[in-house]
Regions:
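Bacterial N-terminal signal peptides that target proteins for export
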Residues: 1-3
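C-terminal motif of bacterial Sec signal peptides marking the signal peptidase cleavage site
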Residues: 12-15
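Acidic/polar, low-complexity intrinsically disordered N-terminal segments immediately downstream
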Residues: 17-92, 162-171
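Short beta-strand and strand-turn-strand segments in soluble, beta-rich domains
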Residues: 88-104, 110
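Short, hydrophobic beta-strand segments
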Residues: 106-109, 114-122
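Short glycine/proline/serine/threonine-rich loop/turn segments at secondary-structure transition edges
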Residues: 122-130
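Internal, hydrophobic beta-strand segments that form the core of beta-sheet-rich folds
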Residues: 129-142
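Ser/Thr/Gly/Pro-rich, low-complexity flexible regions
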Residues: 142-171
């Protein structure tokens, strides 16, 4: 019995060996968060966000913040990323919106925001316009999930029923 106990103790000392733990080493990628929490238990995929300046009396600019998610290790310093306007899917003119001059994903964050400023214009009384933005790979980031690199904003200055308006409000 003593011999068996001694043998087990010796084996346990031999089996203890330090090993390096593998960490995630893939290139970093970005994608737009497309899911919105609609209730405590439900989420909904959002492809287009909508604004009407008629719902924001007195406002001449509105800012929407798109959530951008990081795939890969957190950044150790603020890092530049790129976004382009998809001309073929955009009807808004350059004077109807603005983007930050330099787009930076902040260090230590797994999620950041892309602020897009919409500008009220007289032409928005007659029509709604679309702005489609696309993440673009650069030397710092690749593209994340397929189907999550574009976002779209629809905006106007027309009197429209708000999304939250239901038959209950009318009754």
């Amino acid at each position: 019995y003593t011999l068996l106990l001694g043998l087990l103790a010796a084996l346990s000392l031999v089996s203890c060996d330090k090993q390096e733990i593998e960490t995630y080493h893939a290139n970093r990628s970005l994608f737009f968060e497309r899911w919105k929490q609609t209730s405590a238990t439900a989420r909904e995929r959002i492809d287009t966000v909508g604004y009407s300046f008629s719902h924001y009396v007195g406002e001449t600019e509105l800012t929407h913040e798109f959530q951008i998610k990081l795939i890969g290790a957190l950044l150790e310093e603020d890092t530049e990323y790129r976004v382009s306007v998809v001309d073929s899917l955009t009807t808004a003119t350059g004077d109807q919106y603005s983007l930050p001059e330099k787009l930076m994903f902040h260090k230590g964050m797994a999620s950041d925001v892309l602020p897009v400023t919409l500008k009220k214009a007289p032409s928005l009384k007659d029509k709604q316009v679309y702005l489609t933005l696309r993440l673009v790979a650069n030397e710092n980031f690749g593209l994340g999930y397929t189907g999550y690199s574009d976002v779209k904003i629809r905006f106007n200055d027309q009197e429209v029923i708000p999304l939250w308006w239901t038959q209950e409000v009318t009754d």
